[in-house]
Amino acid sequence: TKVNALMPLSGKIIVIDPGHGGKDPGTTSDTTYEKDINLAISKALEIELSKVGATVILTRDGDYDLSEPNARWRKKSDFDNRINLINNSKANLYLSIHLNYLTNSAYYGPQVFYQEKSIDLATIIQKTLNNSLNSDREMKEIPKKTYMYDKLTIPGVLIECGFLSNAAEREKL
């Protein structure tokens, strides 16, 4: 098939999963919550991918999680619903958007985590992020037996977009 040069992702479906949401803020720094930045990055990414022809599905488009209202184990319910949404989406790939945090605030830069089946995708994304953001972080494999990622059936990666613990990077995020 010939790919349209202006719409190279035409016909492709991409799920973007903004991590956390609702009662789960993710990592925090003062009044800055990971969940909010994850959502903002995801919405911006949705716009950019749509411009080149992709059909984009967000797992959430507001400040909420995906757990059942009366779930006893909210986190597991949230994970299970994200897994089902992604697996049933008929997508070509997923991008899970998160932020990093370490007590040592010197660390900065984006880092891609991948499963073996997604190493090529991870390599492309990590190289692109490093070149664009003047970073030298290396991608890492997601540890085996990681609940959510073990259950996903389509290729994809987790992208830690930067460190909320680094003041300069937090301002950029």
Model-derived features: positions:
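Active-site-proximal helix/loop segments of hydrolytic enzymes
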Residues: 4-6, 32, 36-173
